[in-house]
Amino acid sequence: MKHIVKHIHFVGIGGVGMSGIAEVLVNLGYQVSGSDLTSNAITDRLAALGARIAIGHAAENIEGANAVVVSTAVRSDNPEVLAARHRRIPIVPRAVMLAELMRLKQGIAIAGTHGKTTTTSLVASVLAAGGLDPTFVIGGRLISAGANARLGTGDFIVAEADESDASFLNLFPVIEVITNIDADHMDTYGHDFARLKQAFIEFTHRLPFYGIAVLCVDDPNVKEILPFVSKPIIRYGFAPDAQVRAVNVQARDGKMHFTAMREDAAPLDIVLNLPGEHNVQNALAAIAIATELEVKDADIQRALADFNGVGRRFQRYGEVPVFSEGSTNGAYTLVDDYGHHPVEMAATVAAARGAFPGRRLVLAFQPHRFTRTRDCFEDFVKVLSTVDALVLTEVYSAGESPIVAADGRALARALRVAGKVEPVFVDTVDEVPDALSAIVRDGDVVITMGAGSIGGVPARLAQETKV
């Protein structure tokens, strides 16, 4: 072949989705370069691994590249994209590059509106404990690995399948998981929920005849697509018709204790080192896949008991002092979470109530995208009204233009009318630490939450001397 790809360039390499693929390609021996608007821990890690990183986008950054990888967040007028077009360098969507990686191994793709990152991490951890040494590409940092991607020597690659832009339809895995189907990213589907469900049906059609669809039958929308799935199915969840089912579920000491009933295997007693019933569901998907791949029961149990979590998914920062008039006055427990859809937020609040019973729950929330705030406005009011104290910031736009009556102030006004919680509104995340310090008490549980820039706040809070 005359066109041999040796050098691959990533536009927006500092994002979690792009960086994972870039890291795997570095470890496969490719020359990798990339650019982003700012440096961060991800770009620093890739540079240490040997990738060439440029800060800022410029045509010269793609010099020598045989292919340029872009995500849907990259604009068509980006100077590197324009330069690639001018030089006839192939421009490859991120999902297509992930699909190429999947062609090298047997793919396990985790789809669903909520829970993808945690479920992907649990599957990768259980398979690793079973000696299968999978490659993984995750949308968050797997704490035990210190990274969101790893090149394994085994036959499997475990990755998230992104429905937000319908790019998961580029993937052709041998095992698929669908955790749930909910109304999010509806612009992609013309605000037609039937089109969204049809996309998930088409996703299952990507499986080969020997493939398996692992489906959570607790979710009514997943259950509705069952008749249209033409490949073998493993049903999981709490539902009586689940083939991998959790019973005797108890929350104790921030962990979930349950028994996994399996259709073709012995019951398995599990201690999951995560809180929340939604994480029991995520663990059941991992148990279903591990059982199918003949991972030993003891390895499944050990992996779930030792699971250290994923960055920004109910990530615990420990105890932080409460300062009052210049001196410490007790401490609060700090947790950070990526949740940005009302369903995810409700699951996290429920998990916190279960993990820390009887304690006051303080939430600092940054809404993500004006369109989501508009589309889920009443649901946001409902879930935010369930906490004991609230700091609310302006919406993180993610590049969107403001929408009238779908901003942070409108949300704060609606919450005051609802009358369940009095929000403290701040314009920027930089104001969150001071706003929290004015309301936090000894013994509180503080959760910082959102998919935007609020992710940098917990590290600032945790810099206070631990008690």
UniProtKB/Swiss-Prot annotation:
Keyword Ribonucleoprotein: no
Species classification: Bacteria, Pseudomonadati, Pseudomonadota, Betaproteobacteria, Burkholderiales
Cellular component terms (Gene Ontology): cytoplasm
UniProt keyword terms in alphabetical order: ATP-binding, Cell cycle, Cell division, Cell shape, Cell wall biogenesis/degradation, Cytoplasm, Ligase, Nucleotide-binding, Peptidoglycan synthesis
Gene label: murC
Subcellular location(s) of the protein: Cytoplasm
Binding site for ATP: G112, T113, H114, G115, K116, T117, T118
GO terms, molecular function: ATP binding; UDP-N-acetylmuramate-L-alanine ligase activity
PANTHER family, per the entry: UDP-N-ACETYLMURAMATE--L-ALANINE LIGASE, UDP-N-ACETYLMURAMATE--L-ALANINE LIGASE-RELATED
UniProt entry tagged with the keyword ATP-binding: yes
Predominant cellular place of this UniProt entry's protein: cytoplasm
Catalytic activity of the protein: UDP-N-acetyl-alpha-D-muramate + L-alanine + ATP = UDP-N-acetyl-alpha-D-muramoyl-L-alanine + ADP + phosphate + H(+)
UniProt xrefs under SUPFAM superfamilies: MurCD N-terminal domain, MurD-like peptide ligases, catalytic domain, MurD-like peptide ligases, peptide-binding domain
Pathway in which the depicted protein is active: Cell wall biogenesis; peptidoglycan biosynthesis
Family per record: Belongs to the MurCDEF family.
Coiled coil location: none
Gene3D superfamilies xref list: Mur ligase, C-terminal domain, Mur-like, catalytic domain, NAD(P)-binding Rossmann-like Domain
This enzyme's EC code(s): 6.3.2.8
Organism from which the protein derives: Paraburkholderia xenovorans (strain LB400)
Biological process annotations from GO: cell division; cell wall organization; peptidoglycan biosynthetic process; regulation of cell shape
Role summary: Cell wall formation.
Protein's name in the database: UDP-N-acetylmuramate--L-alanine ligase
